[in-house]
């Protein structure tokens, strides 16, 4: 394995372990000292891959966003299959969904020196949205639905974020019952939503 391949493999391992520690300990509980100890690496080695903990967090968010883009590109299924994949990506890991959103909002509001990485994040997200908008538009037209693409995608995002927050809540999850049936119910609601906006058919003359 050449040095570049070794560097990439080590970086992938660092990101895997960092994400696990972040989800286990929370944003304040995960330290670079703990990460270095877990990986059995010198702390200076970590700084070859990122310059600060905030930069590491944003790189993890970028990696997650890239995974979603790859899913859209690689998944040749119909729209319902893509919607299910997207929602389960978030709802099977609600703690990641909630935490990454909170961290992104915090960093975008005041962190310094992350402009290049935020540009990269937004570029990846825009690429995914360009693909999704076309797919969604075709689906809504096939369903003879009057709902706009914007409104449908916003509803999916809102429902996914809200459901993830409930699944991640120490209070609300006590009242959810089966987490699996809750996920199915949420997804079914989003699949059924276009039927509520069916365009009226013109009566035969």
How should these model regions be labeled?
Residues 1-9, 143, 198-205:
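N-terminal intrinsically disordered/low-complexity leader segments
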Residues 1-25, 29-38, 55:
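Basic, helix-initiating cap at the start of DNA-binding domains
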Residues 39-50:
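Short hydrophobic/aromatic patch on the recognition helix
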Residues 56-64:
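Alpha-helical DNA-contacting segments of helix-turn-helix folds
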Residues 59, 70-96, 149-156:
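Hydrophobic alpha-helical connector segments
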Residues 69, 73, 112-142, 150-154, ...:
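Amphipathic alpha-helical packing segments from all-alpha helical-bundle domains
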Residues 92-119, 165-172:
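Amphipathic alpha-helical segments used for helix-helix packing
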Residues 140-187, 201-205:
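Hydrophobic/aromatic-rich alpha-helical bundle segments in the mid-to-C-terminal region
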